[in-house]
């Protein structure tokens, strides 16, 4: 290398050169490759493909052309990069599962949702989609600026004059240097409606825009869970949207069910999804699937998942959601180029940028059309003058030596324009008038006169010239109005948007499931009805309800659990695996637990000690378990009513027990010789019925008690008790507004007739023999409740709640049941419905279920009928109700056993 060569070198600091070069590279990637423009929603490669197809005449109305030719044109004229990058972009624009409105109409294999690659470009054919013409419409009217291509041989548009907000409609995704964009597709109709709202009110709130833009609308359909991610994305430009595939449940015979997946989340590979499900089944992370196959075809997605018998389908589906991409998230980053710079924008800013751009496009188009109209009017004015002075025009032309001389002579003369002055003023063409008010031809007009055909000399053509001038004058006036009035310009903008909506809008594909869907372990727990059994020794278990047989009244029952004589069942209730429960202990402490966390057992199993489940202190044991509504919104209007064996009661807010730490909290203060009998949720308009083991009962309104905020209070006296008597149950009843006289009169109607009236059957008021009105009887029949009373010797009865008069708390009560040595003491009192089932458990562990419709309805002061045949020394220790459940397979198999069950009436 010579010294002269070294003299041309410029020394630079490598650190500075790295900074400058890397920044140049980064900006090139951001501006020229990876980030879309907010105005037309396109990256340079997509814009070049569409413009190249438009320029080549590869329109939607024309035949398809080989994709290879299109790629070659784009690469040779505008995009000097690899052909594969161009073809991949073209393929994506043709995929109806990638774009909400495909911009390319492809013919051939353009890939699939399984991740299959498109056929080679030499095999596929393409043309512009019909909607793509709305992106390039008016591009020939100087609406957008053009820049030289990479070698200066061609010009390409810097942006397309898009007539709809393509950035939102089709979305975009890309990774640049130090930044990325990920914009989901939306519904065209919703986005255009939002644009119209913004045009009407530029100060509109983003939340108001959310009223019409419900959320992304993915081409693959599926569902969006919750709206918090949508709100965050639209308010800040960033957010995470949870997508979930759509699944249906089908019965396929033999008591089997199948999950049919018909829609999958956006950009999820269907083949990989099926493989992932199979992997999870093999690893036993998803259980209950017996067969899996992909039955998708040209009509849509169909993934068939056959389930094993007796599997809870919801649990399997939740496992699939948790372990696979059937539920996934879409991270929204609404980053786009605005004024040439990358910016994260919210929904309103994106819409505002598009509307502002369309204003510029319409303004530029109007200026272009105005200039064209004025140029045309200028020529027509010259032709009109020439026709009016045709003899002189012909003479000048004949006398001229050549066309140029004729043109100069025409331009040099002044022509009388009195007869066309109105037309000159109409088109606002002042260039023709000289100081004397006469007209002189311009060079353009003179040339047009020389090129005029002889047919223009007819009277019809003269009238047509004047008509054309008037039409042009109308157009010019309209263009000037548009340019002079932003209101008019916005009207046109809205009209054009609405036309696009009417032509291309389609119904929403993606549904929005409102509410929050933070999936936790509970979503993977089978929702199943369980019988919870608690023993005196502190053991607890849950057993599937289907494990017990339904028997008729008087049946001998079956063994429910095997226990020692000193360990008897104290509480039984039925609930879902997702039922929240409050555990109240003998020392007034309360704990919280979900039912599915209890040990699963069988009817003969003993369960587990509660001390191993709850953090109980020494000498502490659970005395009462209170199941609650699964929906905590239902807790707002509920109170908790405490009742103790000594007759004390206390009313508290249920919300005071909403948040309970794992180590529990104080619920109520108890005297040493007292114990907690029951705790129930109640409302202010309801009544409380306290019942004692000696057959007494007291009814009073909940509202007669004030809410006690102190959790350390022992409450107030609820019922005055006789010596050796104690409260054994507390029942919550509906409040009633009828008088005692009306209730007594109503109770004279036979109970069979009252039940018929409650079922809607017609009745004859005179035949009933009461003084009540028909409306009163109907109202009381529909509101009537029945109280079930059960004794330790297996006797029971149902009585109308209307027979229990309302008194003040603190009294001794009234007779609830006539008890004697035969019946034994009362062990349970509760409200029941006609379709309920009764569950009884004895101190020997024997259990029976019977339909309450077979239990006689009598007055309060009766002894009832035998419900349960007891062995010597056997006593009923627990009573519980089971709501009517759907008939299971096991119930069907026991139909014969139920019919043969013994019935005993006394």
From Swiss-Prot:
Domain Topo IIA-type catalytic positions: 35-524
Key word Nucleus present: no
Region (Disordered): 886-906
Record's subcellular location: Cytoplasm
A molecular function GO annotation: ATP binding
Pfam families in alphabetical order: DNA_gyraseA_C, DNA_topoisoIV
EC number: 5.6.2.2
UniProt enzyme class: isomerase
Gene3D superfamilies: 3.30.1360.40, DNA gyrase/topoisomerase IV, subunit A, C-terminal, Topoisomerase II, domain 5, Topoisomerase, domain 3
Reaction catalysed by this enzyme: ATP-dependent breakage, passage and rejoining of double-stranded DNA
Primary residence: cytoplasm
Biological process annotations from GO: DNA topological change; DNA-templated DNA replication
CDD domains: TOP4c (cd00187)
GO cellular component terms given for this protein: chromosome; cytoplasm; DNA topoisomerase type II (double strand cut, ATP-hydrolyzing) complex
Active site residues according to the UniProt entry: 123
Top-rank taxon: Bacteria
Keyword line: ATP-binding, Cytoplasm, DNA-binding, Isomerase, Nucleotide-binding, Topoisomerase
Additional notes on this entry: Few gyrases are as efficient as E.coli at forming negative supercoils. Not all organisms have 2 type II topoisomerases; in organisms with a single type II topoisomerase this enzyme also has to decatenate newly replicated chromosomes.
HAMAP family with a match to the protein in the record: GyrA (MF_01897)
Subunit description: Heterotetramer, composed of two GyrA and two GyrB chains. In the heterotetramer, GyrA contains the active site tyrosine that forms a transient covalent intermediate with DNA, while GyrB binds cofactors and catalyzes ATP hydrolysis.
Role description: A type II topoisomerase that negatively supercoils closed circular double-stranded (ds) DNA in an ATP-dependent manner to modulate DNA topology and maintain chromosomes in an underwound state. Negative supercoiling favors strand separation, and DNA replication, transcription, recombination and repair, all of which involve strand separation. Also able to catalyze the interconversion of other topological isomers of dsDNA rings, including catenanes and knotted rings. Type II topoisomerases break and join 2 DNA strands simultaneously in an ATP-dependent manner.
Protein name: DNA gyrase subunit A
Taxonomic source organism: Rickettsia felis (strain ATCC VR-1525 / URRWXCal2) (Rickettsia azadi)
Gene that encodes it: gyrA
């Amino acid at each position: 290398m010579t010294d002269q060569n070294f003299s041309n070198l410029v020394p630079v600091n490598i650190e500075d050169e790295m900074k400058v070069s890397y920044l140049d590279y980064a900006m090139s990637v951001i501006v020229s490759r990876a980030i879309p423009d907010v105005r037309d929603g396109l990256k340079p490669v997509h814009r070049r493909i569409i413009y190249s197809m438009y320029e080549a005449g590869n329109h939607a109305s024309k035949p398809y052309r080989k994709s290879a030719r299109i790629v070659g044109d784009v690469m040779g004229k505008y995009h000097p990069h690899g052909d594969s990058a161009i073809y991949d972009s073209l393929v994506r624009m043709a995929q109806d599962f990638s774009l909400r409105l495909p911009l390319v109409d492809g013919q051939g294999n353009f890939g699939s949702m399984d991740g299959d690659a498109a056929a080679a470009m030499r095999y596929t054919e393409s043309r512009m989609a019909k909607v793509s013409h709305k992106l390039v419409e008016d591009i020939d009217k100087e609406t957008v600026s053009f820049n030289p291509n990479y070698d200066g041989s061609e010009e390409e548009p810097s942006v397309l004059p898009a007539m709809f907000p393509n950035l939102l409609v089709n979305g975009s995704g890309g990774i640049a240097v130090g930044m990325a964009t990920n914009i989901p597709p939306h519904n065209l109709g919703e986005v255009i409606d939002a644009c119209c709202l913004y045009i009407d009110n530029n100060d509109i709130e983003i939340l108001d825009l959310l009223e019409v833009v419900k959320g992304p609308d993915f081409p693959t359909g599926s569902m969006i869970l919750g709206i918090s991610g949508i709100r965050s994305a639209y308010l800040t430009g960033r957010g995470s949207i949870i997508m979930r595939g759509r699944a249906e449940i089908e019965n396929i015979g033999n008591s089997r069910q199948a999950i049919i997946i018909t829609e999958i989340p956006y950009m999820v590979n269907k083949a990989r999804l099926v493989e992932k499900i199979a992997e999870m089944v093999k690893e036993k992370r998803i259980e209950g699937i017996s067969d899996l196959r992909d039955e998708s075809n040209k009509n849509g997605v169909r993934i068939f998942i056959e389930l094993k018998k007796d599997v809870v389908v919801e649990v399997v589906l939740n496992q699939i959601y948790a372990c696979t991409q059937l539920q996934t998230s879409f991270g929204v980053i609404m980053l786009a180029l605005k004024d040439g710079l990358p910016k994260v924008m919210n929904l309103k800013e994106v819409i505002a940028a598009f509307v502002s751009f369309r204003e510029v496009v319409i303004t530029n188009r109007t200026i272009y059309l105005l200039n064209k109209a004025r140029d045309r009017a200028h020529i027509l004015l010259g032709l009109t003058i020439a026709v009016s002075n045709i003899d002189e025009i012909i003479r000048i032309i004949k006398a001229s030596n050549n066309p140029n001389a004729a043109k100069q002579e025409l331009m040099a003369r002044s022509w009388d324009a009195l007869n066309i002055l109105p037309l000159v003023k109409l088109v606002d063409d002042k260039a023709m008038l000289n100081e004397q008010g006469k007209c002189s031809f311009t060079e353009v007009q003179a040339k047009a006169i020389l090129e005029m055909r002889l047919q223009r000399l007819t009277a019809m053509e003269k009238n047509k010239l004047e008509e054309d001038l008037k039409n042009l004058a109308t157009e010019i006036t309209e263009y000037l109005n548009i340019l002079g009035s932003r209101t008019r310009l916005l009207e046109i903008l809205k009209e054009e948007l609405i036309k696009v909506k009417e032509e291309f809008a389609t119904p929403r594909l993606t549904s929005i499931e409102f509410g929050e869907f933070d999936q936790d372990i509970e979503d993977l727990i089978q929702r199943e009805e369980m019988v919870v059994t608690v023993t005196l020794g502190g053991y607890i278990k849950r057993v599937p309800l289907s494990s017990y047989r339904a028997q008729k009244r008087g049946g001998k029952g079956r063994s429910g659990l095997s226990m020692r004589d000193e360990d008897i069942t104290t509480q039984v209730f039925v609930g879902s695996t997702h039922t929240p429960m409050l555990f109240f202990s003998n020392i007034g402490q309360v704990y919280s637990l979900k039912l599915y966390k209890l040990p699963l057992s069988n009817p003969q199993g003993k369960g587990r000690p509660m001390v191993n489940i709850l953090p109980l202190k020494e000498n502490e044991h659970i005395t009462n378990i209170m199941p609650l509504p699964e929906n905590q919104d239902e807790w707002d209007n509920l109170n908790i009513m405490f009742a103790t064996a000594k007759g004390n009661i206390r009313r508290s807010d249920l919300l005071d027990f909403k948040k309970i730490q794992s180590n529990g909290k104080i619920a109520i203060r108890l005297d040493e010789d007292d114990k907690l009998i029951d705790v129930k949720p109640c409302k202010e308009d309801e009544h409380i019925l306290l019942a004692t083991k000696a057959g007494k009962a007291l009814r009073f309104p909940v509202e007669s008690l004030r809410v006690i905020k102190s959790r350390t209070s022992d409450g107030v006296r609820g019922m005055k008790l006789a010596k050796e008597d104690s409260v054994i149950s507390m029942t919550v009843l509906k409040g009633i507004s009828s008088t005692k006289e009306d209730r007594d009169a109503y109770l004279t109607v036979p109970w069979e007739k009252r039940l018929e009236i409650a079922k809607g059957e017609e009745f004859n008021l005179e035949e009933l023999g009461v003084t009540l009105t028909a409306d009163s009887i109907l109202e009381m029949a529909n509101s009537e409740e029945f109280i079930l009373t059960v004794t330790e010797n297996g006797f029971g009865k149902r009585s109308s709640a209307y027979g229990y008069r309302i008194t003040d708390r603190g009294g001794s009560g009234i007779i609830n049941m006539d008890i004697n040595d035969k019946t034994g003491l009362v062990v349970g009192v509760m409200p029941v419905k006609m379709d309920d089932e009764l569950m009884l458990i004895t101190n020997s562990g024997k259990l029976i279920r019977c339909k309450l419709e077979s239990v006689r309805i009598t007055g309060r002061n009766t002894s009832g009928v035998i419900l349960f045949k007891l062995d010597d020394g056997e006593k009923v220790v627990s009573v519980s109700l089971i709501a009517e459940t759907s008939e299971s397979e096991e119930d069907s198999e026991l139909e014969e056993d139920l019919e043969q069950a013994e019935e005993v009436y006394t």
